Amino acid sequence: MHSDKIDEFLKKRKTADQAGGQDRIAKQHEKGKLTARERINLLLDEGSFVEIDALTTHHYHQYDMQKKKFFGDGIIGGYGVINSRQVYIFAYDFTVLGGTLSKMGAKKITKLMDHAVRNGCPIIGIMDSGGARIQEGIQSLDGFGDIFYHNQLASGVVPQITASIGPSAGGAVYSPAMTDFVIMVDKLGTMFVTGPDVVKTVLGEEVSFEELGGAMTHGTKSGVAHFVAKNEYECMDYIKTLLSYIPQNNTEEPSIVSNDDDPNRLDHNLINILPEDSLKPYDMKEIIHSIVDNHNFFEVHELFAQNIIVGFARMNGKTIGVVASQPLFLAGALDIDSSNKASRFIRFCDCYNIPILTLVDTPGYMPGTNQEHNGIIRHGSKLLYAYSEATVPKITIVVGKAYGGAYIAMGSKNLRTDVNYAWPTARIAVLGSDAAVNIMNRRELASSKDPEALKKQLVDEFTEKFANPYVAASNGTVDTVIDPAETRPMVIKALEMLSNKRDRQLPRKHGNMNL
């Protein structure tokens, strides 16, 4: 009886499924790119995607826009399941007017973000956009503003993840920057506020799309990209792995993943990772891999600010966030980028009930005019703020050097870290022994007949008196000195002890971190 209406509906649905049409889909494939719908189906469990607002269109007539109406209006979105966990998802569709954002497209995105917050589910955005739709003028800009506001509303409530698999320019770049994690696909994803043409016009500077805002640029230099994927398939794998470590929302804890790694496992070779000479570099990741479940560590921001390591792991099946000095780069010294990288990660962990394990081997903050003039004081203070603010369980282990302000900043007892351990190899002091002797004994060394022998003697005396873990243990700065072989079981026991931790901050609207 209603066959005509059903036929009309099926025709419209088929048209919506084809987005910008077969010709544009073919062009997308020729560029080596999947379509928005293909990307969503690749990420979600098979058959789980439920589309919302599939028949949306714009309502503009200027510039012959009435002839350029496509169902979906450049955004495909809805909800589905990833490894049996519900998520909300939207993807910019480059086959429809270059994936430009319209007023209706923005309404679709913010509707999905509202659903995600109300239902306590992660929200995932896939970027492939030419930016604002110029034909809609201020309405398109209003749309971006609404999205930014919703990014703020969702922040710290549900995880927000962005996949950059195409261009993002102008206003389109700020929403990804406000999300928790950004995955960029190498040679496909680009992000910049102003493109190469504008840069050339204004500054006379010749720069390619990749150099200005490609995945490697943002993965290694700006820090905008947390992960750089080789292709779209690896990008989706990053998202799936990331979701496996984090909870659905801020009221839940991450899922416990059972495994066969003995929580009491010892590693008597762990101490051998550290060189006898404390000035020689070593790879802190070897220590991390040794102590976590099944030696699996999911590193975040691997290519950026490599003098500090952050990422996720599990201890006895429970997710933890790891923050660690990396002596292989800048001797593990803290600088502007590493301070920003670590403080951002710590705050994410605190938002989503993820305990923080800190491994320390740092000689201090990076010196020099470049660091001072670019604000190491301001940026370095973020790390102090992030640790102090975090109320999740916090465990710190000093494995090597811990000098000066950097010692305090790296999860010290003074910042209300719950458990502080030190290895016998730890050196906790205001300064390294060599630098301290140079300052305190300058006159003696200058007048000595054998300054080298005297300096060695003074350095040894300073180390014995001050730069060792036992002085710190004697005054409670660290809770105890532990056998490195027992690091894994000691951390797991501490996590179990802290599993019911309740820590409340003083009432306030919000703190004022020195951004």
Write out the residue ranges for each language-model feature.
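Ligand-binding clefts of soluble mixed alpha/beta catalytic domains
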Residues: 1-515
